[in-house]
UniProtKB/Swiss-Prot annotation:
Record-linked InterPro entries: aa-tRNA-synth_I_CS (IPR001412), aa-tRNA-synth_Ia (IPR002300), Anticodon_Ile_BEm (IPR033708), Ile-tRNA-ligase (IPR002301), Ile-tRNA-ligase_type1 (IPR023585), Ile-tRNA_ligase (IPR050081), M/V/L/I-tRNA-synth_anticd-bd (IPR013155), Rossmann-like_a/b/a_fold (IPR014729)
Subunit annotation: Monomer.
Function: Catalyzes the attachment of isoleucine to tRNA(Ile). As IleRS can inadvertently accommodate and process structurally similar amino acids such as valine, to avoid such errors it has two additional distinct tRNA(Ile)-dependent editing activities. One activity is designated as 'pretransfer' editing and involves the hydrolysis of activated Val-AMP. The other activity is designated 'posttransfer' editing and involves deacylation of mischarged Val-tRNA(Ile).
GO MF annotation terms: aminoacyl-tRNA deacylase activity; ATP binding; isoleucine-tRNA ligase activity; tRNA binding; zinc ion binding
The record's free-text note on cofactor binding: Binds 1 zinc ion per subunit.
Keywords (A to Z) from UniProt: Aminoacyl-tRNA synthetase, ATP-binding, Cytoplasm, Ligase, Metal-binding, Nucleotide-binding, Protein biosynthesis, Zinc
Name of protein: Isoleucine--tRNA ligase
Length: 944
């Protein structure tokens, strides 16, 4: 017997089956950076239409977590897809480098500034700490395969960026959006500083809920506001009853708020006459243990407006006022109002010119001049407040209530509202809020619900307190008059001079600046502001300090490109998306972005938030070290980012399985392109075998669908389409069918080269389509593809060598779709025969297809090549009417199938069973087509 193995076109490639990504990827990274891949991308795309995805800066503290990885991978996928769409899409990563968390870390090492270390030295230590954190995070981000300006990122602590933040503040002031006021802000007594909205978390807290009687200054005057419902108006002091869960704020009470249209009742309760909202009377009196009451009179809230009541323990008279926020859902319908400790209280207090009282120091302790409560921390003062109220017979009820309460996101401790002198961006000054709401309409929000979410937040947010009392932050570089508290009239011009100094020496330049340097003889009249900016102002103004300044964003016209997209987690509607919007509106009166894409949070396999305490944290470093970055990237792409993103070892292993299918498909393509040179061996479209033309056309459909999915940021659709194509169109159909032709046809024949041409087209398209997601693997494939090409796939564009089926094709796309169904039914019949031991494999079988006229016409079009599609040694088509009773029914209407074992001898080269085996004396073991493929011109294939 002869050995014909050497006559076969066996697959051969250096592309390994085992990916070994964890070991291979770091070497590929070295190659990318030693060959300046990112620089080559920029050079290749210079002058093209720009796409700017502006990076929201992560905080420079700690290792990156899985959420960071999701965010950076999503950005990288989108940018790489835009690059392949021939956009110039630079990516400048950034870091948020100022603020309290860094201060706290440095304090642990060197102590608080002003004690063991000077403020200047403390800032230097903070800068050094942040730089080390940036280096650590940058290393991990690069390991993810994310390409960008890693050697020149933007840092909010860069001297130039700090200077530009000051310039941004100057523009806000110039456009009249800044004001100073004593206003209640979220205040953390642990931080000793105001908190931004985004720095507040809500957790359950147990608080005293108390009902307090405020006696009327003039009983008769108050009674005259009511309409009697009985002949008797009762007896005893008249009191309005308030309900509060913050007893410690009662020293700052300056009013009782009522609802204008709500009905209030005057009720006799023992020796008192109490004013309570009618709908709440029964619940309140039950709470007081006095259910034997009678209603004496009623009135509306508006009837009691400006009536005076006595503060329960201070020598004060407080008015009844009207407020829209008063409801009768709980409490008494009479709301304790302390303008110094609540935003609603403050707002209504402005209308009634109420005092904004605050007796609480920065550390949460009542000041020494506070009557009754001096030296007590506010939360410890609650019990003392109850004692004072009880002594004055003003406490009607006290219970413990578990309720949602604001906490500091860093310390996880309860915070307070506290009026302090602060700097604010005024939401309703110069129509900032209204203009922002209008501009939101012009932005594309992905998912669409993001629009409504940010609209509600902008509608309801208070003025933005942008000042902080910290050491490590961009200073508010202002001088205010010592007597009038007014800004210096030349503030904007002076801020530019200060910014120039900061560009050279950093923010320390402000602290070192002697006022006389700028103010001259006026220095004695002005006070230098010592506050720093909220870090959300730092990051929120990067549209002005980075996008509007970096040369990478400069167009050939000399103009600066605006950001096309901001992409962050869903918490940033209240954070960076909003701070960026408000500062951009205040500076430029337009949104800083055209599109905003939001992704969900990462949860574990049980849908639980990841936390160290639960032991369910998934480290991206561990995933990369075990499975490789491409598996992590594939998981991100496969997950619908618009909701919570679930990850677990099991889920990542499923991603690894999907990856293996893609890799094996790619390996098959490369192995069967062995010996193929596209410059000499590429077969013209019209000369290709019909099946090959069809798969190229299917690849074009895939490419169009995938590009459309990339453009709509439907990355999980990209994943689904790619994996389906590799598994179904290729793996289960096309690649299965062509193995015979690929391996056995004459090497330089049209039948073989047509097949290789199709594989080449598929590989050229697939490698590009997968590149944004499977960046390392795509680069590995790219390096092994035949033909001249760019050094890296990322400098190219989508493949343009694909084509559609022509209108005069003998087998249309619909015909091939029908054939896939027929083949699936034949496979079922073959499997039954195998299980019954009637045949060993498909090539031992001869099939008879009993078909309706319509299906028969399709099948006979393939002539003798139908057997190659079905991967059997023989295939006959007969009329449906001739079908024997034992023919197998199928799910294809008008088709029955019979399978018999072939009696013909087996060809030792192609393994087909053919009658002509043994007829050639030189090659008695071979069938006729194998003889032709070895010694003749090679077999001719038209269809398959």
């Amino acid at each position: 017997m002869s050995d014909y193995k050497s006559t076969l076109n066996l697959p051969k490639t250096g592309f390994p089956m085992r990916a070994n990504l964890a070991n291979r990827e770091p070497n590929m990274l070295k190659n990318w950076y030693s060959n300046d891949l990112y620089g080559k991308i920029r050079a290749a795309k210079k002058g093209k239409k720009t796409f700017i995805l502006h990076d929201g800066p992560p905080y420079a503290n700690g290792d990156i977590h899985i959420g960071h990885s999701v965010n950076k991978i999503l950005k990288d996928i989108i940018i790489k897809s835009k690059t392949l769409s021939d956009f110039d899409a630079p990516y400048i990563p950034g870091w948020d480098c100022h603020g309290l968390p860094i201060e706290l870390k440095v304090e642990q090492k060197v102590g608080k500034p002003g004690k063991k270390i000077s403020a200047a030295e403390f800032r230097k230590k903070c800068r050094e700490y942040a730089a080390r954190q940036v280096d650590g995070q940058r290393k991990d981000f690069k390991r993810l395969g994310v390409l960008g300006e890693w050697d020149k990122p933007y840092l909010t602590m860069d001297f130039g960026t700090e200077a530009n933040i000051v310039r941004a503040l100057a523009q806000v002031i110039k456009n009249d959006h800044l004001h100073k006021g004593s206003k209640p802000v979220h205040w953390c007594t642990e931080c000793g500083s105001a908190l931004a909205e985004a720095e507040v978390e809500y957790e359950d807290k147990l608080s005293p809920a108390i009902d307090v009687a405020f006696s009327a200054v003039d009983n008769e005057q108050v009674l005259n506001c009511f309409s009697a419902v009985t002949d008797n108006l009762g007896e005893g002091n008249v009191s309005a009853v308030i309900w509060t869960t913050t007893p410690w704020t009662l020293p700052a009470n300056r009013a009782i708020a009522l609802a204008q249209k709500v009905e209030y009742s005057l009720v006799q309760a023992g020796e008192r006459r109490l004013i309570i909202a009618t709908d709440l009377v029964a619940d309140c009196l039950k709470r007081y243990g006095n259910e034997d009451f009678s209603t004496l009179a009623i009135c509306k809230g508006i009837d009691l407006e400006k009536q005076l009541f006595n503060h329960p323990f201070l020598d004060l008279q407080v008015p009844a006022i009207l407020a829209d926020y008063v409801t009768v859902d709980a409490g008494t319908g009479c709301v304790h109002t302390a303008p110094g400790h609540g935003q609603d209280d403050y707002a209504v207090g402005l209308r009634y010119d109420l005092e904004v009282a605050n007796y609480v120091a920065d550390n949460g302790v009542f000041r020494d001049d506070t009557e009754f409560f001096a030296g007590l921390h506010v939360f410890k003062a609650n019990d003392r407040v109850l004692e004072v109220l009880a002594e004055r017979n003003a406490l009607l009820c006290s219970i413990k209530l578990n309720h949602s309460y604001p906490h500091c996101w860093r310390h996880k401790t309860p915070i307070i509202f506290r009026a302090t002198p602060q700097w604010f961006i005024a939401m309703d000054q110069k129509s900032l809020r209204a203009d922002a709401l209008a501009e939101i309409q012009a932005v594309k929000w992905i998912p669409s619900w993001g629009q409504q979410r940010i609209e509600k937040m902008v509608e309801n947010r208070p003025d933005w307190c942008i000042s902080r009392q910290r050491t490590w932050g961009v200073p508010i570089t202002l001088f205010v008059h010592k007597e009038t508290d007014e800004l210096h009239p030349n503030s904007v011009e002076m801020m530019e001079l200060i910014a120039r100094k900061i560009e050279i020496d950093g923010i320390q330049a402000w602290w070192d600046l002697e006022p006389e340097t700028l103010l001259g003889f006026e220095a004695e009249e002005y006070r230098k502001v010592t506050d720093t900016l909220d870090v959300w102002f730092d990051s929120g103004t990067t549209h002005a300090s980075v996008v509007a300044k970096r040369e990478e964003y400069t167009l050939e016209s000399g103009e600066q490109a605006a950001a096309d997209m901001y992409l962050e987690g869903s918490d940033q509607h209240r954070g960076w998306f909003q701070s960026s919007l408000m500062t951009s509106m205040a500076i430029n009166n337009k949104a800083p972005y055209k599109e905003v894409l939001t992704h969900g949070f990462v949860v574990d396999g049980n849908g639980k938030k990841m936390s160290k305490s639960l032991g369910n944290v998934m480290s991206p470093q561990t995933v990369m070290n075990n499975l490789g970055a491409d598996i992590l990237r594939l998981w991100v792409a496969s997950t619908d980012y618009t909701g919570e993103m679930t990850v677990s070892d099991e889920i990542l292993n499923r991603s690894a399985d999907s990856y293996r299918r893609i890799r094996n498909t790619s390996r098959f393509l490369l192995a069967n392109l062995n010996g193929f040179d596209p410059t000499t061996d590429l077969v013209p479209n019209e000369e290709m075998v019909a099946l090959d033309r069809w798969i190229v056309a299917q690849t074009l459909i895939l490419q169009n669908d995938v590009i459309e999915a990339y453009e709509s940021y439907s990355l999980h659709a990209v994943y689904q389409k790619l994996t389906h194509f590799c598994s179904i169109e290729l793996g289960s159909f096309y690649l299965d069918i062509i193995k015979d032709r690929q391996y056995t046809a004459k090497a330089d024949s049209n039948a073989h080269r047509s097949c290789q041409t199709a594989l080449f087209h598929i590989a050229e398209a697939l490698v590009r389509l997968m590149a944004p997601i499977l960046s390392f693997t795509a680069d590995e494939i790219w390096a092994r593809l035949p033909g001249a090409r760019d050094e890296f796939v990322f400098t190219t564009v989508w493949y343009d060598g694909l084509f559609s089926l022509s209108d005069n094709e003998a087998l249309s796309s619909a015909a091939w779709s029908k054939l896939t169904l027929v083949r699936a039914e034949v496979n079922k019949a073959l499997e039954i025969a195998r299980k019954e031991n009637a045949i060993g494999g498909g090539l031992e079988a001869e099939v008879i297809l009993y078909a309706s006229d319509e299906i028969a016409t399709l099948l006979t079009t393939l002539e003798d090549e139908l057997r190659f599609v079905l991967i059997t040694s023989q295939a006959q088509v007969k009329p449906l009417a001739d079908a024997p009773q034992l023919a197998l029914k199928t799910e294809v209407t008008g088709l029955l199938v019979s399978v018999v074992k072939s009696a013909a001898p087996k060809c030792e080269r192609c393994w087909h069973h053919r009658e002509e085996v043994g007829q050639n004396k030189q090659h008695p073991e071979l069938c006729g087509r194998c003889v032709t493929n070895i010694e003749g011109q090679g077999e001719i294939r038209k269809f398959a």
